[in-house]
Design a protein with these regions (language model features):
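Beta-lactam-recognizing serine transpeptidase/beta-lactamase-like catalytic domain environment
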Residues: 3-57, 62-193
């Protein structure tokens, strides 16, 4: 999916595998249509608009913005990535584990796509600053609110059928890294990015 960076308008959209449009126009080719319908690679299925998947690290900028706006992190404050985040069970391993990134600020967290950094930001978003009580619901609600600000709570608006996006419903630490139950199509993610 290629979008205009200024407007979000879709400029090009392709899916794979494909099929020969010429064999479906004009006179019908029932044998070819049957072949397409029985093909296990699903060439009639538009992966760009219908296939949903976890956004992964493309979601991390939303978490960074949420952390900064909610003032649970400062622009220059560092979080020390030890390679394994142990505040939740099961523990979350950074992609660099058994190595570690060490101290990172928000820019470093994004540059290194550090799972530990974003798990800690989510944990802070889920912790009441007055009572220091941790609430999964509070963390998830905050992540959902910020994802919605970027339009991830609704279809992209492209003029062909598309799947409905799914905002996370659990596990703020994993959701903050683009895992959890976040689920979006490529066209929805392209409009956000």
């Amino acid at each position: 999916v290629i979008t205009d960076v200024n407007t979000g308008e879709v400029r090009a959209l392709v899916t794979y595998p494909s099929y020969d449009n010429n064999r479906l126009s004009g006179s019908a080719d029932p044998a070819y249509m049957k072949q397409l319908q029985e093909d296990l690679s699903l060439p009639l299925y538009n992966n760009a608009t219908q296939a949903k998947k976890a956004p992964g690290s493309t979601f991390k900028p939303i978490t960074a913005i949420a952390g900064l706006e909610e003032k649970v992190i400062g622009l220059y404050e560092t979080i020390d990535c030890t390679g394994e985040y142990k505040e939740v069970d099961p523990h979350i391993k950074c992609w660099i584990y058994p190595g570690h990134h060490g101290p990172l600020n928000v820019v470093g967290g994004l540059q290194n796509s550090c799972n530990y950094f974003f798990a800690e930001v989510a944990h802070r978003l889920a912790t009441n600053r007055d009572t220091l009580v941790y609430s999964t619901d509070m963390g998830v609600d905050t992540i959902r609110r910020y994802a919605s600000m970027f339009g991830l709570n609704r279809p992209s608006g492209i003029e062909i059928p598309e799947t409905t996006p799914e905002l996370t419903t659990e596990d703020p630490e994993r959701s903050a890294m683009g895992q959890g139950t976040n689920s979006y199509s490529n066209v929805q993610l392209s409009r956000y990015v």
